[in-house]
Amino acid sequence: HFTYTTALISQASLFEAHERYLDLHIVLSGCEQVALAPVESLDEAEVRADEDSTMYRGTPEYSVTLDQNRFLLVFPGEGHLPKLSDSVPMNIDKLVLKIPC
């Protein structure tokens, strides 16, 4: 369970991707943008093997809007950059479930 304030897309930082888990993102309140790109199009920045997480730099191929009516399932090899807003920063209450694959 996470609570945070989104950042503007122009202030975006690192994408994250996993090898052993799917991420199920469920927004409980608020609205956020999640930028997405295949890891093959990104540059590796940092490996966090103990967290099954690799961080990447790069440009999003597309983004999706998450709110209480939409969820996002992110598969291994999909770079994702959550916690974004395209206009005004918003307060978000969200669950992220890690599903072994």
Identify what each model region corresponds to.
Residues H1-H18, L28-D43, P76:
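Conserved short histidine dyad/triad with adjacent acidic residue
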Residues L24, Y62-V64:
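Short, surface-exposed secondary-structure edge patches
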Residues T65-L84:
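Conserved metal-binding segment of the jelly-roll/cupin
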Residues L24, F71-L73, P89-C101:
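A short hydrophobic beta-strand segment most commonly corresponding to one strand
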Residues E19-Q33, P38-E40, V47-R57, K98-I99:
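Short, conserved beta-strand element in jelly-roll/cupin
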